[in-house]
Amino acid sequence: MIGTMNTADKSLIQMDLALRRRFSFTEMPARPEFLAGVTAFGVDVEKLLTRINQRIEALLDSEHTIGHAYFMPLKKLENNADREACLASIFQSKIIPLLREYFFDDYERIGWVLNDSVKAKENRFILLQQSAQLPSFSALFPKEIADSLSDRRFRINDNAFASAEAYQGIVA
């Protein structure tokens, strides 16, 4: 029997301890090389995953690197448009939510992992919301609190998922 478990998942600690007593474990690190030759949006997916994982390891640790399995559906797709749609879906429904969990919704750090700071605003996955769209801190809090806060309200840029430059910027 083969079972898999993400070592970063601490919510199942009792189950983890029980399994560790009963089974032997083999570490299965991410293997971006399994994605060699796969491209989408003009980006080598092996390099994309490698760069993302290098940044995650620098900011967190190797236990949080993203596995190649998330990207394996791309391998069976022949059509570039299908691969692009699949990669967008992987990022939107798997990678971004996973990064949100890893970084406790610290969107600034998520942006660092995705190298958003070097991209044009429209190609960033994470955007700082415009203050004009939101109530000011002075409208929300007493002056002494409002004056001490830095506006760090972020949002996901849904348009980036269909942007080649958004993915190309990750490996830049």
Give the location of each predicted region.
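C-terminal regulatory/interaction module of P-loop NTP-utilizing enzymes
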Residues: 1-172
